[in-house]
C-alpha cells in the first residue's frame, strides 16, 4: 500500500508526464554539486584540504578551537565516522572562517547529517551572504528540511549574485536583447544574449541540485517565489513549467507554458510543457493539437513529442504508427526502436518488448537500461534464474543498485537470505557514498519479505548515523504499518506532519494510512486535501482521496475519483482500488475489465492480485 507514498516522495523520478529536460536535470552534476558526490570524494577532499588552506590564506585568523576541531573531524572521516566528522566540523564552523564553514557544509551534506549541515550552512551564508555556492547549498539543505521560506530567500540571493555578475560584464538578465538605437555597436546585444544564456544555465544547474536533495513540490514553491516576480524570458517560464509538471500541478504548468509562448510562440520546450500539461489535466484534444504544433516547429523532436503524448493518453497504436512514420522520415533509427520497446513494455506486450530490447543490444545501440528491462521481463515471465543471471551482468554497471536490489528480492523469494543481503553489502563496501540508499533498500526488502523487525532495526541504526533524517523516519513509519504496528506508524507520521506541515508526501501518507484502517476519516480526508492543494494532479494523492471516499461509503463517487487517479498514473494498486469501488457499486463487469487491463500491465502486483482474490475467491 505504501508503494504509492514512496512514489509521491519520488515524484520527480516518474517520467511519464513531464519532459526529458527535468529528467536530465537529475543526472547533471552542476559546479557546486561536484564536491558532494559521496563519501569517496569527501575523503579525497579532506585529504587535500590542508594544502588548499595553505594555498588560500584565511580571511581572518582561524580560532584555535576551530582548527583543532577541524583536525579531529578529518580524523573522524578517515576512520569512517561520518557522524563524528559532521558534528565536529559543524562545531568548528561556529568559530571558523569561510573555508571551514564551506568544508563543514559539504562534509555534512555528503554524510547526510542534516542538523550538522544546516548549522554549518547557516554559518557559511552568514560569513559569505553573496556567495553563490553558499546560497545554493543553503537552499538545498533548507528544502530537504522543508524550510521553504529560508530556501526562497537563499535563491533570491543566488539570483542577485547572478545579476551582479552580469552587471560587472556590462549587462544584466532581463536587459532588452536588441539596441533601440540603429547602427549601435553589435557587442552589447551579443553580450546580453550570452549573459541570458549563462543565467538560464545557472538556474538550471541550481534546479538540478535542489531536485537532487528535495521533492519537486518544495522546489517549485521556493523557485517560483524567487523567480516568478521578475521573470521575463521564455526559458524561465519553461523551467517553472517543467517544475510544475514534476510537482503534478498541471494548471500551473499550463499557465507557465502559455506565458513562455506569449514571449516566443515557436519555443519548442514551452510547447512540450504545454502538451504534457494538457495530458495531466485530461484534455486530450488540446494535448494532441499542441504536440502537432511542436511537430510543425521541428519534425523530428516534435514528432517524438507527439508519440509520447499519444502513449501517455493510452493511444498506443497511434503512438506506434507515429514512431514508424518518424523512422520513414529519417529520424534516428535507434531512438525510434528504443521508444517502440518502451511503448511495448508499458503496454504489457512483453514479447515485442523483449524482441526490440534484444535487437537494440545486438545492434550496439542498447545500454545498461535496456539490459535491465530484459532482466525485468525475464522475472515477470516467471524465469527467476534467467532474471538473476541477467541482473548479475549489471552488478557493476550504471544501474548496479537497481539490478542488485531486484536480484536480492528474487533470492529472498526463494529464501536465499544470506546471498541476497550479500549483494547489497558487497556493493556498500565498494560504494560507501551510497550507504544510506543501500540501507533504505535493504530495510524495504526485508520488510517486503516478512522481516519487518529486521528492517526496523536497520533503520534505527541508520538514524544513529543520520539523525533526524526525513527519509529514514518516513520509511520507518512505512515499515511500522507493514508490521501491523499501525498506531506507532500514525504517531510517527503525525510527528513528521508537525515538523513538515506543508509536505504533501507526509500529509498524504498519514491521510492514506488513517483511511486504509478506517480511522478518523474526516481528519484523513482533510490531510489528503491539504496534500492535493500542493500537488493537485498527483496520482497517489488522488488515489488516497478516492480511497477515503470509498471508506466513507461513497463507492460510486470514489470510482470516479479513482478512475481519474489511474489516468494520471497507471499504478496497479490504484487499479485495485478503482476496481473494488466499481465492484461494490454494482459495476462488476467494469471492475473485471479494469483489473484485467491492469494485470496485463503488472501481472505480479501483490495488492492487485490480493484484491481480486478477496472479491473473487475462485479467480485464477
Give the residues covered by each predicted segment.
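N-terminal polybasic/positive-inside topogenic patches
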Residues: 3-18
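Bacterial signal peptide processing site
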Residues: 50-52
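Short, Lys/Arg-enriched N-terminal segments with co-localized hydrophobic residues
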Residues: 18-24
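Generic detector of N-terminal low-structure segments
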Residues: 4, 21, 31-34
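C-terminal motif of bacterial Sec signal peptides marking the signal peptidase cleavage site
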Residues: 46-48
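Bacterial N-terminal signal peptides that target proteins for export
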Residues: 26-39
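Alpha-solenoid helical repeat scaffolds
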Residues: 58-78, 86-620
